[in-house]
């Protein structure tokens, strides 16, 4: 039997299409599924064949129930990439600002905030 693994993370965003497009551009992911969600909302699953991020928005576009407010208790989403410099160039080209760069054993990393204020850590162990 294999070890347990995270299959997906579900986050609430104002515009799932915008966030999905950003993730497709930055991480070369694809949309696995898109459709209606609870409470009259809409969800997009974007990722790879092995894992994904579910992007949820409520029934009223831009209106997020307080129980799903961003950042509570989520700290950040970590994404491992092979080429940190190329990914950072795509982050900058998307108009986002990388910050908190660090080289540490065993890898390198930086962070950025998406348009919803969700923090991402991008790390490479290559």
Give, region by region, the residue ranges found by the protein language model.
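Vicinal oxygen chelate
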Residues: 2, 34, 88, 92-126
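Core segments of cupin and vicinal oxygen chelate
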Residues: 10-53
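Exposed loop/turn and edge beta-strand positions of beta-sandwich/beta-sheet ligand-binding modules
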Residues: 40, 73, 106
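Conserved beta-strand in the GNAT
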Residues: 54-56, 121
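N-terminal beta-strand motif that seeds the catalytic metal site of vicinal oxygen chelate
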Residues: 1-20, 74-79, 126
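Short, charged/polar surface micro-motifs in flexible loops or helix N-caps
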Residues: 49-53, 60-62, 84
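A short, acidic/glycine-rich surface segment
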Residues: 32, 40, 60-66
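Mid-chain, well-packed structural core segment of small domains
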Residues: 70-91
């Amino acid at each position: 039997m294999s070890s347990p693994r995270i299959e997906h993370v579900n986050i609430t965003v104002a515009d799932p299409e915008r966030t999905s497009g950003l993730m497709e551009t930055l991480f070369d992911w694809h949309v696995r599924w898109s459709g209606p969600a609870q409470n009259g909302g809409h969800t997009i699953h974007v990722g790879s064949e092995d894992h994904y991020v579910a992007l949820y928005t409520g029934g009223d576009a831009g209106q997020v129930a307080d129980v799903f407010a961003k950042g509570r208790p989520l700290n950040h989403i970590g994404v491992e990439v092979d080429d940190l410099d190329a990914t950072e160039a795509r982050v900058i080209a998307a108009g986002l600002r990388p910050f908190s760069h660090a080289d540490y054993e065993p890898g390198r990393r930086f962070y950025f905030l998406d348009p919803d204020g969700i923090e991402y850590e991008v790390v490479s162990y290559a």
